[in-house]
Amino acid sequence: MARIAGINIPVHKHTVIALSSIYGIGLSRARKICGAVGVPSDKKIRDLSDNELEGLRAEVAKYPVEGDLRREISMDIKRLMDLGCYRGIRHRRGLPVRGQRTQTNARTRKGPRRLARK
């Protein structure tokens, strides 16, 4: 297993797919990273040289990934809730934030139904 950004990435997969296993790196960003380092995206991680791995580590370090990104997202949501804006209120109440209908749908966001007692 190769370690990039503190994550063990699978060595038997292609570079782009293996990089996308890091939280915060999708396929398009993984392709951009491979292009910047000069690594073919269809090359497997186990076939990379140490210099190529170091280049990938340096390039990934330029982006917010894993714990830093999770912390940043949670702080953004907390800021919205502290402001008391519409989106913050929706987050606080556990309702859909982006304008979806809630009368008949949104069961995932609202949680299981509360049954009325007789």
Swiss-Prot record:
GO molecular function: rRNA binding; structural constituent of ribosome; tRNA binding
GO biological process, one term: translation
Compositional bias per record (Basic residues), positions renumbered to this chain: 107-118
Region of interest (Disordered), ranges: 94-118
Pfam families given in the database record: Ribosomal_S13
Subunit structure: Part of the 30S ribosomal subunit. Forms a loose heterodimer with protein S19. Forms two bridges to the 50S subunit in the 70S ribosome.
Domain of life according to the entry: Bacteria
Designated gene of the protein: rpsM
GO cellular component: cytosol; small ribosomal subunit
Keyword set, alphabetical order: Ribonucleoprotein, Ribosomal protein, RNA-binding, rRNA-binding, tRNA-binding
Protein name: Small ribosomal subunit protein uS13
Family designation: Belongs to the universal ribosomal protein uS13 family.
Annotated coiled-coil segments of the chain: none
General function of this protein: Located at the top of the head of the 30S subunit, it contacts several helices of the 16S rRNA. In the 70S ribosome it contacts the 23S rRNA (bridge B1a) and protein L5 of the 50S subunit (bridge B1b), connecting the 2 subunits; these bridges are implicated in subunit movement. Contacts the tRNAs in the A and P-sites.
Species: Nitrosococcus oceani (strain ATCC 19707 / BCRC 17464 / JCM 30415 / NCIMB 11848 / C-107)
PANTHER family named in the record: 30S RIBOSOMAL PROTEIN S13/40S RIBOSOMAL PROTEIN S18, SMALL RIBOSOMAL SUBUNIT PROTEIN US13M
